[in-house]
């Protein structure tokens, strides 16, 4: 891999790009691509470019935003240090490795396109916060896509399925009263009963790649002082769907089971899967790339075409202190991306 890509990844890390604040890193990449002679377009803090022509359109996507740095960092999260084999810093693994690998492949294809294929590279914002100013801004411009590769740290295994996400805000209503007397209706107890009901609920349908729907209560809040029976209790439920139920179906199943009101923050991030017989998956199998179902959400959820998730790095490093990626992981990804696109 040319040293210019290592330097670019260091510069990306050194340019803070927390979700919703990607302007500077987007400008950095836009200018870099222009210097490389690529005709790049920008919408908001999203970039896209294309090369080649033909009946088949392939989308490459990686995201340029990051989460906020963990307080546990021992290195400078924006340092972009390189020791010769490893690059450290926020976003190195998620998703800088995929950005660099896809860029390197695209630069080569821009100079020598694959006959019969139109390749579109998209570098997009607001993936980490599931915002609406990311890849969704570009899709109407791009048009029909035959298949997509979403670059994420997958240990160079291919995710052919991905869990969806729905967050429910639960609210139990009771009646305030004095805690010293037998009065009032305790909203906290109502919420606890409902949380137990949700905890015990079993979804019947099991996905071969994703397993059962996973449902976890993650937050609860009630009461204002020790001697008042709380009249309201709020809680949050994180639901990871498995593709056999839509988020709307899950909500419709759960609401009648509880007294609390369950309000979805959004139902748009459904689970996704791509049939094994799809050409890109068959190509991966022929190359010996392992297939799996991913528990984590990505831009796959926002694409309606056949899509897979594949890239350098390890998902277990994402959102952790002292994030890093090995240079040879990026180099392997470049080789495999090229082989997948042939």
Language-model regions, residue ranges each:
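Hydrophobic/aromatic beta-strand patches that form the interior of the parallel beta-sheet core
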Residues: 58-60, 122, 149, 308-310
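A structural signal for short hydrophobic beta-strand segments in well-ordered beta-sheet cores
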Residues: 40, 80-82, 217-220
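Buried hydrophobic packing segments
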Residues: 29, 99-109, 138, 191-194, ...
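A generic beta-sheet turn/junction motif
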Residues: 42-44, 51-53, 163, 174, ...
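Acidic/histidine-rich catalytic neighborhood of metal-dependent amide-processing enzymes
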Residues: 95-167, 171
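Active-site metal-coordination/substrate-binding segment of hydrolases
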Residues: 57-120
């Amino acid at each position: 891999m040319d040293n210019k890509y290592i330097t670019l990844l260091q510069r990306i890390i050194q340019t803070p790009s927390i979700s919703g604040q990607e302007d500077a890193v987007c400008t950095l990449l836009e200018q870099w691509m222009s210097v490389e002679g690529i005709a790049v377009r920008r919408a908001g803090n999203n970039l896209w470019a294309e090369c080649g022509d033909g009946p088949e359109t392939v989308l490459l996507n990686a995201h340029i935003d990051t989460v906020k740095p963990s307080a546990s960092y021992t290195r400078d999260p924006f340092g972009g240090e390189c020791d010769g084999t490893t690059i450290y810093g926020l976003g190195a693994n998620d998703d800088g490795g995929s950005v660099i690998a896809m860029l390197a492949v695209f630069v080569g294809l821009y100079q020598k396109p694959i006959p019969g294929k139109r390749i579109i590279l998209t570098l997009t914002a607001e993936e980490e916060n599931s915002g609406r100013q990311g890849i969704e801004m570009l899709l109407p411009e791009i048009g029909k896509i035959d298949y997509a590769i979403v670059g994420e740290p997958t240990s160079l295994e291919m995710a052919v399925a991905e869990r969806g996400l729905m967050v429910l805000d639960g609210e139990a209503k009771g009646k305030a009263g004095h805690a010293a007397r037998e009065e009032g209706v305790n909203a906290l107890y109502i919420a606890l009963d409902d949380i137990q009901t949700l905890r015990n609920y079993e979804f019947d349908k099991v996905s071969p790649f994703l397993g059962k729907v996973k449902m976890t209560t993650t937050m609860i809040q009630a009461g204002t002082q020790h001697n008042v029976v709380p009249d309201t209790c709020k809680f949050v439920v994180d639901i990871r769907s498995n593709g056999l139920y839509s988020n709307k179906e899950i909500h419709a199943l759960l609401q009648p089971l509880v007294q609390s009101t369950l309000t979805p923050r959004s139902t748009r991030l459904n689970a996704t899967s791509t049939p094994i017989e799809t050409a890109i998956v068959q190509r991966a199998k022929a190359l010996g790339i392992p297939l799996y179902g991913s528990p984590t959400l990505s831009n796959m959820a926002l694409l309606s075409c056949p899509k897979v998730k594949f890239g350098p790095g390890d998902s277990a490093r994402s959102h952790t202190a002292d994030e890093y990626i090995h240079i040879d992981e990026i180099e392997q990804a470049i080789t495999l991306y090229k082989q997948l696109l042939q």
